[in-house]
């Protein structure tokens, strides 16, 4: 398969993971998609662009190239459900709105999907694990920020309009509570934006698996409402007029994350 990810090593103890901005499809997935799925509506559009200041902060960055329709990097390899409510699995068969992803009988075979696990999912998670280990060895701790976005209205997944900033810490298990409180305070002070901590999106597999505060690895997921930086309808254009202020809040969140780490591990 083609190159499956982009990784850039930084100089501070922070890794920003971007598992869902990819738009590449495998031939088997491409051949089977229903017409309405071809717009790749459920993509976390423009996330690398939204976070392109990460290099200035010194953060390491990791971004996936393949679409979540191929394999969802934020699900466990055994596909154990993460939420009791409606969700999508390791190998999605439905769109976020509940409609089928594939034409009847056209989903990739089990053998094909095992290849996606080996060639797309595994390298991404190997990179996370290796980089967190490197950061912890160098600094004594590591910080993981899992960057996501989603349409602000998806009735099949949640009621009403999603808050703008959705912080997830696996109900407090993936990071120090003092860190979560500091990040929530940043969101609360961000004029014109709504937020929630551990609401509908508490953190997917990446946050839950790698966040081990007792081992000095602190993980936080941000699920961002896409209306804060882009058009939510095709062709899903990036809106610099909206994104500028949103990026400023994200940057403040990441700077606060780094500052907390310096203070906690001084």
Swiss-Prot record:
The keyword Hydrolase applies. Keywords: Histidine metabolism, Hydrolase. There appear to be two competing pathways for the degradation of N-formimino-L-glutamate in P.aeruginosa: the two-step degradation of N-formimino-L-glutamate to ammonia, formate and L-glutamate (via HutF and HutG), and the direct hydrolysis of the formimino functional group of N-formimino-L-glutamate to produce formamide and L-glutamate (via PA3175). GO terms for molecular function: N-formylglutamate deformylase activity. GO terms for biological process: L-histidine catabolic process; L-histidine catabolic process to glutamate and formamide; L-histidine catabolic process to glutamate and formate. It is an enzyme of class 3 (hydrolase). InterPro entries: HutG_amidohyd (IPR010247), N-FG_amidohydro (IPR007709). This is N-formylglutamate deformylase. Belongs to the N-formylglutamate deformylase family. NCBIfam families: hutG_amidohyd. Monomer. Its EC number is 3.5.1.68. It comes from Pseudomonas aeruginosa (strain ATCC 15692 / DSM 22644 / CIP 104116 / JCM 14847 / LMG 12228 / 1C / PRS 101 / PAO1). Pathway: Amino-acid degradation; L-histidine degradation into L-glutamate; L-glutamate from N-formimidoyl-L-glutamate (deiminase route): step 2/2.
